[in-house]
Design a protein with these regions (language model features):
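Catalytic cores and adjacent flexible loops of soluble metabolic enzymes
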Residues: 1-187
Length: 187
């Protein structure tokens, strides 16, 4: 609410992921604090590393007395359509069920949703998905070593990739990417 108080004409839109299970509460508090918008996902593609379900938030916010300018009938049609798309994506491997789950350990690993889905994808491409827990545990260590950069693109990908390299090499910093080297040189 301090942002809205200081700059009332500035639109505030909040974006988060459901990875840790806290997104619905985060959005409720953001709306209560005066956020102008929240990013959501239609229910078949919501949850996990995606955003909270549009339909659920629309319902909950209306129940709390907020005006929600969405047509529920259209949302139902959209959800029905995307249920089929989701099923196809799950069947062909485009959508990974791991990334659609809640993982409260991300609170400890300090990994945002988008970064988690990229880590999963990277490990799968290397046939090393069994190393996910080790890579997750290594990530905050790499982040600390690098001086706690914000975990947004591109630094989130750099930290995650280095964590994966450390785990797969069996030794920390045996392999160091050029992006990490440039970051450490201040480039």
């Amino acid at each position: 609410s301090a942002i809205k108080d200081a700059v009332p004409e500035l639109p505030v839109v909040v974006h988060t992921h459901c990875t840790t299970g806290l997104a619905f509460m985060t959005y409720l508090k953001a709306v209560e604090a005066g956020a102008d918008g929240i990013d959501t996902a239609i229910s078949p593609f919501s949850g996990g590393t995606a955003q909270p379900a549009t339909e659920t938030l629309a319902y909950a916010l209306r129940q709390l007395g907020y005006q929600v300018d969405l047509d529920d009938k259209v949302l139902v049609k959209m959800a029905d359509f995307f249920k089929g798309v989701r099923a196809d994506f799950l069947a062909d491997g485009t959508l990974d069920p791991i990334s659609m789950a809640t993982d409260t350990q991300c609170l400890n690993y300090q990994i945002p949703g988008g970064m988690l889905s990229n880590l999963i994808s990277q490990l799968k491409m290397m046939n090393a998905i069994d190393k996910l827990d080790e890579a997750l545990a290594e990530t905050p260590k790499v982040r600390a070593d690098l001086g706690y950069p914000p975990l947004v693109t591109p630094t989130s990908q750099m930290v995650g990739s280095q964590a994966v390299q450390n785990v797969l090499a069996g030794e920390r910093y045996k392999v160091v990417g050029k992006e990490i080297k440039a970051y450490c040189r201040g480039e």
